[in-house]
Amino acid sequence: MPRNRTLWLVSIMALVTTAFASGPALAQDPEELEIGFVPSIEAGALAEDIQPLADYLSDALGMPVRGKVTSSYPALVTALQIGQTHIGALPPLGMVQAVDVAGAEVILQSVRFGSPTYHTQFFTNAPDRYCASAPVVNERREAGEMLPFLNCNGTDRPFDGVPVGPIGLEALQKIERGTTVAFTRAGSSSGYIFPATVLANQGIDPVTDLNVIFAGEHDYSVIAVCTGEAEVGVSYDDARPDTVTDCDVAETVVVFAYGPEIPNDGIAVSGDLSDGLRDRIKQALLDYAATPEGAAVLDTIYNINAFADPDLGSLQIIRDAVEQLGYGQ
């Protein structure tokens, strides 16, 4: 059954804000650094994937850099605020919290397929309901291999194409009251905040009209739809090639809509670091992304193709979406 709205919002805001207590300021730059990540897929794999980046930064900066996988984005923002973590890879909402609450500085934003933005994808195991015509095969590259997946309602594209949302949102009106929908986390931009506002704009209350599952990671949302636990799911575009399961994702999970464009994730550093160290961290990351080895590691970690200077003005759309959902009211 849908949860009570007040309890829903209180629990979300408790997760997002309660840990942001003030910590002691650092008098000088630390002797070693910690770079933090939060898994969008299986956490154990991420811990292994980030080690080459940490090793590179250690050499480039001339000081030990350790990688850490944290349990949630609020926890990572808190770690940045109190100086426990010094560099954080954050999603859009995490960057807003890092700037507005933790006093951190965003130094870079990710670029994928030449684009500084991305979007939510809506997918289903019931294409007869949500697809206006038969799904078509799209190929996606994963670990150098081309894999076929199904899309409909104009969401299909070449494997290296860069679609711009929104596309196919009229199909969301076919979601009936009581339908089970798999989101990822309550604080995820593409996994909850933006799809929830899109649904609300289509006349569907994501709290009272739906049976909601919070799957946790984006690949788990795909699995929930593939196994029939949910009829509709959401994730970043495209989480299907990153999903490891015995279920036949390629034949079962059909993408039928894209949400509006969202600014990409980025890198934030603790506000306690000196300007000189911040600049060195930024340059080291730019240099790493420009090497074949670094490009491969960043692609494995978060499908990052490059870094660019941050557009902090683009984050206002995140603040607006959070306000529309009533977080903190």
Residue ranges and their predicted role:
Residues 34-40, 112-121, 246-285, 300-317:
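Periplasmic-binding protein-like
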Residues 92-103, 198-201, 224-251:
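A ligand-binding cleft/hinge motif common to bilobed small-molecule-binding domains
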Residues 58-69, 84, 146-160, 177-180, ...:
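A local structural motif
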Residues 10-21:
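Bacterial N-terminal signal peptides
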Residues 21-27:
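Sec/Tat signal peptide C-region and signal peptidase I cleavage site
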Residues 30-50:
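Extracytoplasmic "Venus flytrap"
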Residues 67-78, 91, 205-223, 261-263:
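Short helix-initiation/N-cap motifs at beta->coil->alpha
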Residues 110-191, 202:
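A conserved helix-loop-strand patch within extracytoplasmic ligand-binding domains
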